[in-house]
Amino acid sequence: IKETLATFNRLRPNKKWLLLAFDVAASEKHLWTAWYSMKRNQIKRKMIANSPDAEFLRIIAGTHQVRIAFENAGIRNSDHSAWIIRLPDIELSPKVEDNFINREIYNNHELEAIYMIERMNGSLISQRPNPTLEGLKRIVYENAIIESKSLEECFLLHLISSNL
């Protein structure tokens, strides 16, 4: 893992790129919500982490502690897959309803992502994020999972706890 992280850090064009543990990404809505929360914290100068990539991981992990965020949402030796995430350059409007996020924006940096995947001896998998119990356990979701809530809702509720 250390070699993979070192290679990734050397290859990534800037700190808008990060590696995220595969199981901790519940859905595109989950990832966009984490990004939006990170961006708001950045605008308000309320980020706990020193960089947007670390703040995003912290929010996904649902914690106030950056070290714990890397332990829970970062990649580990036992991981076989990870997400390469690029935090988009989108300016936010003060009103939530005035913001438009083109969900296809991730295709804008596909070539850079493929280059990094190849240099890290990885392979591209065509799969979207999916909420799992394993992912909730990994980010230390401690609330009861009630049948009336979807797994995605549990991930979103946990994400919100990072800013409480």
Regions found by a protein language model. Name each.
Residues I1, K29, S161-N163:
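Proteins with a high burden of low-complexity, intrinsically disordered sequence enriched in S/T/G/P/A and R
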Residues I1-D23:
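Long, hydrophobic N-terminal alpha-helical segment
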Residues T4-T7, A69, V96-E97:
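Hydrophobic side chains in well-ordered alpha-helices
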Residues F8-R12, A73, I117:
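Hydrophobic, Leu/Ile/Phe/Ala-enriched alpha-helical segments that form helix-helix packing faces
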Residues R10-N14, M38-R40, R103-E104:
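Short, low-complexity, polar/charged sequence segments that are solvent-exposed and flexible
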Residues L20-K46, R128-I145:
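Short, intrinsically disordered low-complexity segments
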Residues E28-L87:
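Ordered, amphipathic secondary-structure segments that act as subunit-interaction surfaces
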Residues I75-L164:
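Glycine-rich, aromatic-bearing surface loops/beta-hairpins
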